[in-house]
Amino acid sequence: MSDISPQLAKEAPKGGFAGADYNAVATSAELEGINLLSIEFSINPDCLLYEAQWKLSFGRKVLSCHYNEEDHSVAAIFQYHVTAKYGRKRALHCVADYGVFYQTHNGATEEAAIGFCRNVGTFAAYPYFRALVARLTNDAGVRLPPLPIIASTAHIPPKTPKKAKK
């Protein structure tokens, strides 16, 4: 289950742009492409016998994001990684960079276009990374569970601290 909401923003998101600008980009942007840009994959053969004891960690980050006002386009590079460790040894490691490209409407603000691409692009490319890891680990004869889904928390209000009991 995902906590991603299809609701339009009711207030200005963080990043210095108005909710209306962001919503205009979100409702008009068209995905132009998702491309694998680079990959690094390695397995430590000494750890293969201990596969059931591997501890997995995952991560993602935005490497860059650029808006081209002339072409009305925005592009970002997202990096995803998964690492399996057996004790202190790295048993498996996969890092992949994906480029995500959107066409925006004429008049989109740079801040809104970049905010949209950073927010939405990470979810657009992640299924490709999950499939890549599944294919590579299968080809290597490794049985990993499916990578977890990622979910947006942008629309979830922050928790208020509880008062200490006296």
What do these predicted regions represent?
Residues 125-126:
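Helix-rich interaction surfaces within compact, conserved domain-sized segments
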Residues 1-120, 131-166:
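N-terminal intrinsically disordered, cationic/polar leader segments
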